[in-house]
């Protein structure tokens, strides 16, 4: 569909939160690196997850789909040295996780992608390639990366203010190399929550890594992943949309969430509570955010960049000023998210000023409505849908199908909660 036209209304009801995309990526990778059969259940087949599945299959994993389950056997992973082709689509996780994994043994691999993926930085890996004499060539505009060689253990110095996906990619890979390795983080580490997810998943599959206060990671070589069965928990980055709607006056019960989760995006609860909303735990794995007298705050984007667009919606409708800080990495996501959410919410009647690494948001009582553009970014599209619940007039969102990247059932769930929309 080319656009959705939403008539403003409050959302009410219960919604099963989709499985965590971040955890599904990690479980699929660890299972594919295990010698034996694993069953990964509660999978949502978004475009990003399909990209990782197909990528691991290209590297030799046997993956079968049974409804919402994956049966994965990694007995033949990287057993041959044939030329390998991996289509990452628009998934930065697939690309940055699988690049080092593909080099566990001597290989020739071609990675391609679409959309903004070619513009997302890979300099961290290029520096490693050059240091280890791994051949590579790269076309930026449309991702086309060719690499040839194998990765060796040793010392890896990585900046902490880059995407945590680089560090996770190395954490998956280095335990399988012959020699011991050390990852040294040279600046303050951002997105620690995503590193915690990786370390937790790796440990579940039998691999040990010593974490020295996120300053360095000590990794013994010659380890092996052990197969296991794993159920993917609900995704806090998707729940954040409904939590935000709740903070703005909707009444939504979010099902299948684990309050003890390591997911960094769980921080959305603390941020919304700090602004004046209230968390209700009605039963086990069932959470709601209740509307309160919302006030502006300071939100540090460095540890939870994915939930910043929808938190900007909440801030736009809160009293006083909110500042988004340390958000420069949002400019190199599926789109420039700082610019996109600022531009589109201002079209709806918000008062937002864009800074180099953040936003200044002056709250308004209500938004007006109008025509906006998703920038073909799933999180921008869903954030604008939540904004519509506090608009006075219709909201028209162009290019809404981009939600398939992470949450294919979003528009159906939106309607099931009472959202009034028509497609064109």
From Swiss-Prot:
Q: What class of enzyme is it?
A: transferase
Gene Ontology biological-process annotations: amino acid biosynthetic process; aromatic amino acid family biosynthetic process; chorismate biosynthetic process
Q: What is its main location?
A: cytoplasm
Q: Could you tell me the keywords of this UniProt record?
A: Amino-acid biosynthesis, Aromatic amino acid biosynthesis, Cytoplasm, Transferase
Q: Which residues bind phosphoenolpyruvate?
A: 21, 92, 120, 165, 337, 379, 405
Cellular component (GO) terms are: cytoplasm
Role this protein plays? Catalyzes the transfer of the enolpyruvyl moiety of phosphoenolpyruvate (PEP) to the 5-hydroxyl of shikimate-3-phosphate (S3P) to produce enolpyruvyl shikimate-3-phosphate and inorganic phosphate.
State the similarity comment: Belongs to the EPSP synthase family.
Q: What is the protein's quaternary organization?
A: Monomer.
What is this protein called in UniProt?
3-phosphoshikimate 1-carboxyvinyltransferase
This chain's source organism reads Clostridium perfringens (strain 13 / Type A)
- What gene does the UniProt entry assign to this protein? aroA
């Amino acid at each position: 569909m080319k656009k959705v036209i939403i008539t403003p209304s409050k959302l009410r009801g219960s919604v099963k939160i989709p499985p965590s995309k971040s955890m599904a990526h990690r479980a699929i990778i660890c299972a594919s690196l295990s010698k034996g059969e694993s069953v990964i259940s509660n999978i949502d087949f978004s475009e990003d997850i399909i990209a990782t599945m197909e990528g691991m299959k290209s590297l030799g994993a046997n993956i079968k789909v049974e409804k919402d389950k994956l049966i994965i056997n990694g007995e033949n992973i990287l057993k041959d040295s044939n030329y390998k082709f991996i289509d990452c689509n628009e998934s930065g996780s697939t690309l940055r996780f699988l690049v080092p994994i593909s080099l566990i043994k001597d290989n020739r691999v071609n990675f391609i992608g679409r959309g903004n993926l070619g513009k997302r930085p890979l300099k961290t890996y290029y520096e490693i390639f050059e240091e280890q004499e791994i051949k590579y060539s790269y076309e930026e505009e449309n991702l086309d990366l060719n690499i040839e060689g194998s990765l060796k253990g040793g010392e890896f110095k990585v900046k902490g203010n880059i995407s945590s996906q680089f560090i996770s990619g190395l954490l998956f890979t280095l335990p399988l190399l012959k020699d011991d390795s050390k990852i040294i983080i040279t600046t303050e580490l951002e997105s620690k929550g995503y590193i915690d997810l990786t370390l937790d998943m790796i440990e579940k599959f039998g691999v040990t890594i010593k974490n020295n206060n996120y300053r360095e990671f000590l990794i013994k070589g010659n380890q092996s992943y052990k197969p296991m069965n794993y159920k993917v928990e609900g995704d806090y980055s998707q729940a954040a949309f409904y939590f935000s709607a709740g903070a703005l006056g909707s009444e939504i019960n979010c099902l299948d969430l684990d309050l003890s989760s390591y997911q960094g995006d769980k921080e959305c609860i603390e941020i919304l509570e700090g602004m004046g909303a209230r968390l209700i735990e009605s039963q086990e794995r069932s959470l709601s955010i209740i509307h309160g007298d919302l006030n502006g705050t300071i939100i540090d984007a460095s540890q939870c960049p994915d939930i910043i667009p929808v938190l900007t919606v909440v801030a736009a409708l809160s009293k006083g000023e909110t500042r988004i800080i340390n958000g420069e990495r949002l400019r190199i996501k599926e789109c420039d998210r700082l610019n996109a959410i600022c531009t589109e919410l201002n079209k709806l009647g918000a008062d937002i000023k864009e800074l180099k690494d953040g936003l200044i948001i002056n709250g308004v009582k209500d938004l007006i409505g109008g025509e906006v553009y998703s920038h073909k970014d799933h999180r921008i599209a869903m954030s604008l849908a939540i904004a519509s619940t506090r608009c006075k007039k219709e909201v028209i969102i162009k290019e809404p199908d981009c939600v398939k990247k992470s949450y294919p059932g979003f528009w159906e769930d939106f309607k099931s909660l009472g959202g009034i929309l028509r497609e064109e």
